[in-house]
From Swiss-Prot:
The protein's name: Large ribosomal subunit protein bL34
Cellular component GO terms, alphabetical: ribonucleoprotein complex; ribosome
Gene: rpmH
Cystines in this chain: none
UniProt entry tagged with the keyword Ribosomal protein: yes
Entry superkingdom: Bacteria
GO biological process annotation, one example: translation
Homology family: Belongs to the bacterial ribosomal protein bL34 family.
InterPro entries: Ribosomal_bL34, Ribosomal_bL34_CS
Keyword Nucleus: no
MF (Gene Ontology): structural constituent of ribosome
Pfam families in the record: Ribosomal_L34
Entry keywords, A to Z: Ribonucleoprotein, Ribosomal protein
Origin species: Actinobacillus succinogenes (strain ATCC 55618 / DSM 22257 / CCUG 43843 / 130Z)
């Protein structure tokens, strides 16, 4: 049986990366929330 999580660095950064977040208004809100919370890492 094939496992559901097949890691790929490229796919990961394209969907959850910093530039993907900055591309949309809501993504920027995500980053702002994480900055406000004091997250060490903002995005993948």
């Amino acid at each position: 049986m094939k496992r559901t999580f097949q890691p790929s660095v490229l796919k990961r950064s394209r969907t959850h990366g910093f530039r993907a977040r900055m591309a949309t208004k809501n993504g920027r809100q995500v980053l702002a929330r994480r900055r406000a919370k004091g997250r060490k890492s903002l995005s993948a």
